[in-house]
Amino acid sequence: MNYQPTPEDRFTFGLWTVGWEGRDPFGDATRTALDPVESVRRLAELGAHGVTFHDDDLIPFGSSDSERYEHVKRFRQALDDTGMKVPMATTNLFTHPVFKDGGFTANDRDVRRYALRKTIRNIDLAVELGAETYVAWGGREGAESGGAKDVRDALDRMKEAFDLLGEYVTSQGYDIRFAIEPKPNEPRGDILLPTVGHALAFIERLERPELYGVNPEVGHEQMAGLNFPHGIAQALWAGKLFHIDLNGQNGIKYDQDLRFGAGDLRAAFWLVDLLESAGYSGPRHFDFKPPRTEDFDGVWASAAGCMRNYLILKERAAAFRADPEVQEALRASRLDELARPTAADGLQALLDDRSAFEEFDVDAAAARGMAFERLDQLAMDHLLGARGAAA
């Protein structure tokens, strides 16, 4: 297989990813600032489909209207020159100290109103640039101490904010949807809507739930010790996987933001297998940080590695699914039986069926092997390249 990405693969990168200067809580920047125009051009050369941005990635905070116009003009020209797209945008409601207690759920009402206006302004720009999805990551929406935040009131304010944003895009006739990005902690001690499940439940309480989905990130769910492919499967099942952030993470620790495939490789394999077999058609968006040890050559090598790893895993997953021995193993593990309704004949037929309870041989059923180990080893063989690739 050719592992050279093309725009048809729909790989996208946030400007903040390759543009990360390497500054962390313990050390200053190790790289200089990267011009967004340079990011667009270099990513296009690597075969990416598009870029995404926070408002402050593209337009420095506090810019005048004329400065804002020039920043957008240069960026738009770079998009036109390269054919790169902007499928998604988002708002930075976490860097400036005004957001130290959050944006949509800050205890201060004036901060909440400012956060909404800042978001609405960038939604206008996102639509202007062709974005179809608007991500909301509430990194500062949370608390470090129990008395600091009435979570019920905070959720009311969160609902109010999203309902207002939904009203705004509807009134403007914008063809854009929102994707809530969960995270359990960091930078706040505890963040509201910490997992995919929390976000899905919250969405059902909104006035226009059809406008809202989720943007799960590999590392965020794994920080909570959760199975990321399972979370994605539930989002797909709910029809709410509006966007996805791909990166690498090694277990329950700080948000590592490694390049995709550099963390839990088995989970990455099952994730790609799921996305490809489920027919997910959205961008494959990389939200990672090139390590601060790297110069700019390393930045671009890291970005290229994200795409290459995805394509390798896509090939391995396709080979796994096409392998006749795997197909036989899937049947032996009775995956086809799981796909059959348990009681398509209805409740009464179930109650009347003596073989379902009175005559059910629990000992015989308990003695059946599931053959999962053989199936899993076949997956490992494909992941590790010990079996042939798909034709």
UniProtKB/Swiss-Prot annotation:
Q: Taxonomically, which superkingdom?
A: Bacteria
Binding site residues for Mg(2+) 1? 181, 217, 245, 287
Compartments, as annotated in UniProt: Cytoplasm
Reactions it catalyzes: alpha-D-xylose = alpha-D-xylulofuranose
UniProtKB keywords: Carbohydrate metabolism, Cytoplasm, Isomerase, Magnesium, Metal-binding, Xylose metabolism
Catalytic residue list? 54, 57
What is any one of the record's Gene Ontology cellular component terms? Answer: cytoplasm
Residue sites binding Mg(2+) 2 per the record? 217, 220, 255, 257
Q: Which InterPro entries match?
A: Xyl_isomerase-like_sf, Xyl_isomerase-like_TIM-brl, XylA_actinobac, Xylose_isomerase
Q: List the disulfide bonds.
A: none
* One MF annotation (Gene Ontology) recorded for this entry: xylose isomerase activity
> Record keywords: Magnesium included?
yes
- List, alphabetically, the Pfam families matched: AP_endonuc_2
Query: Is S-adenosyl-L-methionine one of the keywords?
Result: no
What EC number(s) is this enzyme filed under?
5.3.1.5
Q: Which GO terms describe its biological process?
A: D-xylose metabolic process
Spell out the family assignment given in the record's similarity comment: Belongs to the xylose isomerase family.
User: Per its UniProt record, what HAMAP family does this chain match?
Assistant: Xylose_isom_A
UniProt-recorded name of the protein: Xylose isomerase
- The organism named in the record is Streptomyces albus G
